[in-house]
């Protein structure tokens, strides 16, 4: 039986330049780098992981993927995969010694993946939300969203600027 109910969710880290990534991190670890460099001695960013049948690889990190650092609520895009243990990120802010999660990116403002319909939002703590609707290049501000509300608009980004609501989930 088909359902139009969401089956996946991700906590939203508002960003003026990074779209909401696909829910479900595919790799994680601890960053020992600083600035725009993410370093993890135990990572396999280039090689990924061997599938169970030994016939190929999966979970290779790619430019455009999104790194979340949950403890500081920081997000950055992967600019380049420099080695198995080192990534260059779009912005500084991820701290050494902090845990990170990497998610598949869904493209920038004018570079969205084909077929990306965006996400519904659930707002835990109310306020204003500046969003980029899924089929638009112009952001809009949704005013006075109340606590524990669903936003009836498919969006690809929640902006940090002009957003006062918090505890936001993107539902897919």
Across the structure, where does each feature detected by a protein language model lie?
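Surface-exposed, low-hydrophobicity beta-strand/loop segments enriched in small/polar/acidic residues
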Residues: 1-25, 60, 66, 77-80, ...
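Small/polar beta-strand repeat architecture
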Residues: 26-59, 68-107
């Amino acid at each position: 039986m088909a359902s139009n109910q969401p089956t996946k969710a991700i906590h939203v880290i508002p960003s003026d330049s990074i779209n909401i990534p696909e829910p479900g991190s595919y790799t994680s670890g601890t960053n020992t780098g600083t600035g725009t460099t993410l370093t993890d001695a135990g990572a396999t960013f280039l090689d990924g992981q061997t599938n169970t049948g030994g016939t190929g690889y999966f979970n290779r990190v790619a430019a455009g993927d999104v790194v979340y650092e949950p403890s500081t609520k920081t997000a950055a895009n992967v600019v380049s995969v420099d080695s198995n243990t080192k990534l260059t990120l779009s912005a500084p802010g991820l701290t050494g010694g902090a845990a990170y999660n990497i998610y598949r990116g869904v493209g920038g403002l004018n570079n969205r993946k084909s077929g990306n319909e965006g996400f519904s939002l659930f707002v835990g703590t109310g306020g204003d939300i500046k969003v980029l609707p899924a089929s638009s290049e112009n952001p809009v501000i949704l005013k006075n969203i109340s606590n524990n509300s669903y936003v009836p608009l498919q969006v690809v980004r929640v902006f940090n600027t002009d957003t006062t609501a918090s505890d936001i989930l993107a539902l897919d």
